[in-house]
Amino acid sequence: MKRIEEKEKAIMDEIMEMHALAEKAVELSFRAMRGDKSVVREISRIEQQTDVLDTDINYACTTFIALFQPVARDLRFAISIMRISSSYERIADIAQEISLYESKLPEIVFKAEKYLKKMFDAVKEGYTKTEGLKERMTELDNAVDEIYVEAIEQLEESCDVNAVLTVRHIERIGDLLAKIAARQIFIKEGRRVWII
C-alpha cells in the first residue's frame, strides 16, 4: 500500500468513527425527546468527542494536501472530507441542543427517526458505492421535510418555541446528511450534485 493510500485509510477510519458518533447522538436525542433525560450527559460526551475528531480530521487532511500535493480524486477526497467531518460535528451539536429542550412534540415528529436512520445507512454505504445515492437521499430528505412541514402546521397555535426549534433541528440533520451524500458523489464521480 502506498503512503498516500495509508493516509487516506487513516482519515477514513476517523470519518467512520465520526459517522458512528453522530448517528448515536441522533438516536439518543430521540430518546431525550421521548422524556428520557438520562441520555443528556452521554450526548454531551459524544459532542465533545466529535469536536476533537473534527479538529484531528481537518489537521490530517491539511497535512495530506501539504505532503502529497494531491490532484483529481485525491484532492477532492481531502477537501470534501474536511467538510463532511464538519457536517458530522454539526449533527452532534444539534443532537445535543435537541436533548436539552423540554417540549410536547406532535407524534409525527418521531416518524422522522426512521428516515434519519435510513439516511445514515445510505451515507455509510456511500463511502464505498454512490450508485443511486442521490435518488435515495432525495427521497429520504423529502420525507423528513414533509414531516417538518406537517409538524410546524400542528405547532402553529401552541407557540411552543422549544418544539418548533426541535422540529427545525431534525429537518436540519436531514439536510446535513444530504450534503454529506452530495460530497461523497463529488469524491467518487467528480461531479457536483444538489440533493434538495
UniProtKB/Swiss-Prot annotation:
Q: Which residues form a coiled coil?
A: none
Q: Does the keyword Metal-binding apply?
A: no
An example GO CC term for this entry is: cytoplasm
Q: Which domain of life is it from?
A: Archaea
A GO molecular-function descriptor: protein homodimerization activity
- The entry's keywords: Cytoplasm, Phosphate transport, Transport
Gene Ontology terms: biological process: intracellular phosphate ion homeostasis; negative regulation of phosphate metabolic process; negative regulation of phosphate transmembrane transport; phosphate ion transport
* Localization per record: Cytoplasm
> Which InterPro entries does the annotation name?
P_transport_PhoU, PhoU-like_sf, PhoU_dom
Function field: Plays a role in the regulation of phosphate uptake.
Entry similarity comment: Belongs to the PhoU family.
Cross-referenced NCBIfam families: phoU_full (TIGR02135)
Q: What subunit structure does UniProt give? A: Homodimer.
Listed name of the protein: Phosphate-specific transport system accessory protein PhoU homolog
Q: Which organism's genome codes for this protein?
A: Archaeoglobus fulgidus (strain ATCC 49558 / DSM 4304 / JCM 9628 / NBRC 100126 / VC-16)
